[in-house]
């Protein structure tokens, strides 16, 4: 009874303390000596009836309840392993050694599986916790408020300065009119002395040109005459009288006038073309006289001066 009590007390000590290194070596030596036992399907039993694997990331959210069963697994392994603290391996009988060896062989791989699963689960939980802490520690910096961005954009690109620059360039363009006539006091640059034409616009989805010239041509059927002359003319000769059929300077003047006279019998509106053309020239002259800001003098001297200094002198003289 005494050795059994000692053995029982020794096994109870194993639950609290892990075995020493020399005891493990002796156990490995005994396992190597004993023949490997073949187990039947009835003797093989599962440790747990259900696994703890989940498909979702809920495992990381529950680290606290998992620590308790892992400690119980390690304690079970320490309880099952039979270790003699008194080191009395030589006094054991052969039958007892065989029984213990068989039990060790039967439970050895199961214990190794349980310890491996426990270590894998613990390492997985530790790695997940460490990765989560690393991600939390390396979180990106907070984004600035959109209001601050707009203030920065306004500081770097002020719109007021750009508008001032544009106004300054426009003022410089207005002060470029420096060639003033001595008689009328008006500018003599090419832009100011260019003749002004009557206004025109595009109609019918920008396909038809609405102008005074086109109204005269379509109203007097001159467009039909131009089309006939265009198809009858020879382009190799270079005589484009189809654009101006009433001109006297181009070739075949008599034949053109005879053809237009014959067409006027069927199209009497062609007779209205000469007076309509005269009225158009008169309207152009009046419009140009009113809207042209430059000088109209034929023979006059040009004075180079600034517009601001010569404006007062120009206003005093008659135009």
UniProtKB/Swiss-Prot annotation:
Keyword check for Acetylation: yes
Region Disordered: start-end pairs: 54-160
N-acetylmethionine modified-residue sites: 1
Domain SPR: 183-295
Compositionally biased intervals (Basic and acidic residues): 69-79
Residues in coiled coil: none
Composition-biased stretches (Low complexity): 112-131
InterPro entries listed in its UniProt record: Sprouty (IPR007875), Sprouty_domain (IPR051192)
Keyword terms, alphabetized: Acetylation, Cytoplasm, Developmental protein, Membrane
Any one GO BP annotation for this protein: negative regulation of epithelial to mesenchymal transition
Record's bilayer topology term: Peripheral membrane protein
GO cellular component: cytosol; membrane
Subcellular location: Cytoplasm; Membrane
Domain observations: The Cys-rich domain is responsible for the localization of the protein to the membrane ruffles.
Biological role: Inhibits fibroblast growth factor (FGF)-induced retinal lens fiber differentiation, probably by inhibiting FGF-mediated phosphorylation of ERK1/2. Inhibits TGFB-induced epithelial-to-mesenchymal transition in lens epithelial cells.
Subunit structure comment from the entry: Forms heterodimers with SPRY2. Interacts with TESK1. Interacts with CAV1 (via C-terminus).
Family note: Belongs to the sprouty family.
Designated name of the protein: Protein sprouty homolog 1
Organism whose genome encodes this protein: Cervus elaphus (Red deer)
């Amino acid at each position: 009874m005494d050795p059994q009590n000692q053995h029982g007390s020794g096994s109870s000590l194993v639950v609290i303390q892990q075995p020493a290194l020399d005891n493990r070596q002796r156990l490995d030596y005994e396992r190597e000596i004993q023949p490997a036992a073949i187990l039947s399907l009835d003797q093989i039993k599962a440790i747990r009836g259900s696994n703890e694997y989940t498909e979702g990331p809920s495992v990381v959210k529950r680290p606290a309840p998992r620590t308790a069963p892992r400690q119980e697994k390690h304690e079970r392994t320490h309880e099952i392993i039979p270790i003699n603290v008194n080191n009395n391996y030589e006094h054991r009988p052969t039958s007892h050694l065989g029984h213990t060896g068989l039990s060790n062989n039967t439970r050895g791989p199961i214990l190794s599986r349980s310890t491996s699963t426990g270590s894998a689960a613990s390492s997985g939980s530790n790695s997940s916790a460490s990765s989560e802490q690393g991600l939390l520690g390396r979180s990106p910096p907070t984004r600035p408020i959109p209001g601050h961005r707009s203030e920065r954009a306004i500081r770097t690109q002020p719109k007021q300065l750009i508008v001032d620059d544009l106004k300054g360039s426009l003022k410089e363009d207005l002060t470029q009119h420096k060639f003033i006539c001595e008689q009328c006091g008006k500018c003599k640059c090419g832009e100011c002395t260019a003749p002004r034409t009557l206004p025109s616009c595009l109609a019918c989805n920008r396909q038809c040109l609405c102008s005074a010239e086109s109204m005269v041509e379509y109203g007097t059927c001159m467009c039909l005459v131009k089309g006939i002359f265009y198809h009858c003319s020879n382009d190799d000769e270079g005589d484009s009288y189809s654009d101006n059929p009433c001109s006297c300077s181009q070739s075949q003047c008599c034949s053109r006038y005879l053809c237009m006279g014959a067409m006027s019998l069927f199209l009497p509106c062609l007779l209205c073309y000469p007076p309509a053309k005269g009225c158009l020239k008169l309207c152009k002259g009046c419009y140009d006289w009113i809207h042209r800001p430059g000088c109209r003098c034929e023979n006059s001297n040009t004075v180079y001066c600034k517009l601001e200094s010569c404006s007062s002198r120009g206003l005093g003289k008659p135009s």
